[in-house]
From Swiss-Prot:
<keyword id="KW-0169">Cobalamin biosynthesis</keyword>
<protein>
    <recommendedName>
        <fullName>Cobalt-precorrin-5B C(1)-methyltransferase</fullName>
        <ecNumber>2.1.1.195</ecNumber>
    </recommendedName>
</protein>
<dbReference type="InterPro" id="IPR036074">
    <property type="entry name" value="CbiD_sf"/>
</dbReference>
<dbReference type="GO" id="GO:0019251">
    <property type="term" value="P:anaerobic cobalamin biosynthetic process"/>
</dbReference>
<comment type="pathway">
    <text>Cofactor biosynthesis; adenosylcobalamin biosynthesis; cob(II)yrinate a,c-diamide from sirohydrochlorin (anaerobic route): step 6/10.</text>
</comment>
<keyword id="KW-0949">S-adenosyl-L-methionine</keyword>
<keyword id="KW-0808">Transferase</keyword>
<dbReference type="GO" id="GO:0032259">
    <property type="term" value="P:methylation"/>
</dbReference>
<dbReference type="Pfam" id="PF01888">
    <property type="entry name" value="CbiD"/>
</dbReference>
<keyword id="KW-0489">Methyltransferase</keyword>
<dbReference type="InterPro" id="IPR002748">
    <property type="entry name" value="CbiD"/>
</dbReference>
<dbReference type="GO" id="GO:0043780">
    <property type="term" value="F:cobalt-precorrin-5B C1-methyltransferase activity"/>
</dbReference>
<comment type="similarity">
    <text>Belongs to the CbiD family.</text>
</comment>
Length: 340
């Protein structure tokens, strides 16, 4: 028996749950709320809420406070769960603080989001100070507009609709701002990608995963200093590598596995999806196979000769590294095991 994580849709095996020190009912409630992530050794990591969810909390609370003082709200998230946060809101002015989480590099933890609301004949959402402005094309928000991505903007709108219906008004004009947004933005890549003057309001799920998906930027130094390191190939690989190897440093290597292996001084594991890991080990694995993709090959012939040979070549190329291949649900398809 396993539980399905409602945020990333991965399976949480019962054996992982059994290893945890948290009582079963309490742990299951935490998992199903989206806030807790269980690792393979039973340890727990805590998710936080995105900038999008925090902005949503502030916006809804500001509208509700037009009628009465508010100290707690529930808002929708893009994955269908409700987010619950404390907030201070009175007379159309709300302050929500972005929750702490176990993502060590989340520089927006503890940041205050401010929303101001006035009654109106329709719903409008505007961005104030501290929210960046898009200065070039190619991003999810249009050039010249505030850097509020479509998913969180929809999330904010849905929450404000809930609020105006709850207090019985026709609409509200809501302005969202971050007093320290411009300051924090200097620590991000926003300036390089074309967002100026503040941070971006982001979040495809509404939740912040408790691991870093940009560790590859730290390159060789991080790997060299790690006693145990997992090299992985993408964001899905990061998720499952963190769960499967809780006492390892997880590094996003992408297509640079070979380069990063040379920097490692301790134990090394390579973990990721078959189309990335196996093709690193055997770039020609699809040649004369009759398959267009590795995913197709895995689905049709999971124990086939081409898969077996590619895994053997990957293990050989790994030079003693443990090779773990997972599918998109986190199921381990192949594992070379601990190397002596």
């Amino acid at each position: 028996m396993s539980i399905i994580d409602p945020v990333n849709k991965s399976k949480v095996p019962q054996e992982w749950i059994n290893k945890s020190n948290i009582p079963g009912d309490e742990l299951e409630e935490g998992i199903m709320s989206g806030m807790l992530v269980v690792l393979s050794d039973g340890s727990i990591l805590k998710r936080g809420y995105t900038t999008g969810t925090t902005a949503t909390v502030a916006a809804k609370a500001a509208v509700l406070s037009l009628k009465k003082e508010i100290d707690h709200v529930s808002v929708p998230t893009p994955v269908g769960l409700r987010a619950h946060m404390d907030v201070k809101a009175k007379d159309g002015h709300a302050v929500a603080v972005k929750l702490n989480n176990d993502h060590e590099s989340d520089i927006t933890r503890g940041l205050e989001f401010v929303a101001r609301a006035v009654e109106s004949d329709k719903i409008t959402i505007t961005a104030g100070e501290g929210i960046g402005i898009v200065t070039r094309g190619g991003l999810q928000s249009k050039k010249g507009y505030p850097a509020i991505n479509p998913r969180p903007m929809q999330q904010i709108m849905e929450a404000v609709v809930e609020a105006v219906e709850e207090i019985g008004i026709k609409g509200a004009s809501v302005e969202i701002s971050l007093p320290r947004g411009a300051e924090i933005a200097k620590q991000t890549l926003n300036g390089r990608i074309g967002v100026e003057g503040g941070i971006s309001i982001l979040g495809t799920t509404g939740f912040v995963e408790p691991w870093n998906d940009h560790l590859g930027e730290m390159k060789s130094d991080l790997i060299r200093d790690a006693a145990k390191v997992v090299l992985t190939t993408g964001r899905i690989g990061i998720r499952y590598s963190t769960m499967l190897f809780p006492d390892y440093t997880v590094v996003l290597a992408g297509s640079r596995i070979s380069e990063f292996m040379e920097s490692a001084t301790g134990k090394v594991a390579i973990c990721g999806l078959p189309g990335l890991v196996l093709k690193w080990g055997d770039p020609d694995m699809l040649k004369d196979s009759g398959f267009a993709t590795v995913s197709e090959m895995i689905e049709v012939e999971p124990q086939g000769e081409h898969i077996r040979r590619a895994f053997e070549k990957t293990v050989e190329k790994g030079k003693g590294a443990r090779i773990v291949v997972v599918d998109r649900d986190g199921t381990v398809l192949m594992d070379s095991g601990e190397q002596e």
